[in-house]
Amino acid sequence: KVTVKDVEKICKKYNPKIIIKEINDEVPNLVFSLSHKKLMKKGIKFLYALDESIQEMISKWSKQDLAKELEFVKGGMNEYADNRGKISNFELTEPINMIGLIDSKKGTIRANHYHPQQEQKCLFTKGQIIEIFQDILNPNSPKITQVVNEGEISTIKPNVAHTMVFTKDTTFLNLVRGEREHENYGVTHTIKHVFVDEKERDLLMNCYKFDCRSCGSTKLKRVVSLGYQPLANNLLNKKNDKNDLYPLEVNYCENCHNCQLSVAVDAKKMFSNYLYTSSTSKVFRDHFVNAANKYVKELKLSSKKSYIIDVGSNDGVALKPFKDLNFKNILGIEPASNLAKLANKNKIKTFNGFLTKKNLKKIKKKADLILASNVFAHSDNLKEMAECMINLLSPKGTIIIEVQYLMNTLKDLTFDNIYHEHYNYWSLTSLIYFFNQLEAKIFKAEKVDTH
């Protein structure tokens, strides 16, 4: 015979935070006790040791995703393609009694409503949209976005406000379960709820990232949403000024394991007059002094002959230790005009501009060492920048990059490292894939503690 107290002790053994809830209900429910008379009369028997069974249940439950999906997207199943075209199959788990065929032109907006009772499904046969949705029953729910592509079905839960921004000419089927009156808005089907205007539509269409910047795949899955946020370092000049708000969401590429933001805000808007100067941090200054001494020793660099470039050089913090070691041939590349001016004032030669193919001809080549600290998080045009770095390198040269490590972000829950300047979030796996595409090889990796 097993009592509730017995079960509680076993549960607490594997999960010390568990609590027991006492009820007076005679009918078994979600918190029924194993000593309940009605259950015992049914002759319930444990086929396995209770201790092991509870341990297994707690272990499995701990790994279950408890996130509430307000709206989700799926592709077709059991697809078949030949020279005639492609067949995709979609399973509908509930009856459909009406189908609407809808065409929408690029740049238009639909929905801006919610369904109080019914679940809505939309099957997209052509085009592409950005969906924006929000749980209206939860006052703290963030506004979330996702992309729906041709050949995918989107399911919208009841009481979820949603809007469609059409990024291409689009055709879709609206699969309706239940009653739908002739007028679009009615108590039994749809209630108007405008929460996306034309300004937000234009903002999304101008900066949304539809494909992986590492491999080009469109199979991106949203893994984190922090709602709409202002740009972190663009401070207001006046108290009553208003900031533009952008989605702050991380998408995961199922093809190459790259993680990136759902939007790519124009780099000139964020970096042309950058406020953060790296030299203000003693941790960074000390780190780059130690790094310079290490690189000189390991790579056998010569203060007279070696040529060193720092991409995204900020105020010259990583090059100053080389200057102090009497290296004559150093160059910073910095897009922020205020920082480039500051570095040049401090006698650290700095080119003001982005590292692009257009600017490549203005920069001396054959570098023995190219540094890039956190630049691979700050660049939307990753491949172009990386190709330029390889082009600037001497045949025996080395590129050393520093990036925030995704595994540490997950382990330490440092979500404050997620902001719009950081377009990308790297693991070693995704970095190896990225450089392999460029026929470059990562031959060494190590952790450094600079944050």
Where does each model-flagged region fall?
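N-terminal juxtadomain amphipathic helix
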Residues: 207-283, 446
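Double-stranded beta-helix
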Residues: 73, 142, 163-204
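C-terminal substrate-binding subdomain of Rossmann-fold SDR/epimerase-dehydratase oxidoreductases
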Residues: 1-75
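Short acidic-glycine-tyrosine-enriched beta hairpin
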Residues: 136-158
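Short, glycine-/aromatic-enriched active-site segment of Class I SAM-dependent methyltransferases
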Residues: 401-424, 428-430
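Glycine- and acidic-residue-biased ligand/ion/polar-headgroup-sensing regions
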Residues: 117-136
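A short, N-terminal "cap"/entry segment at the start of jelly-roll beta-barrel domains
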Residues: 66-98, 109-111, 202-203
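A short glycine-rich, Lys/Arg-flanked "PGG" loop and its adjoining helix->strand segment in the class I
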Residues: 383-398
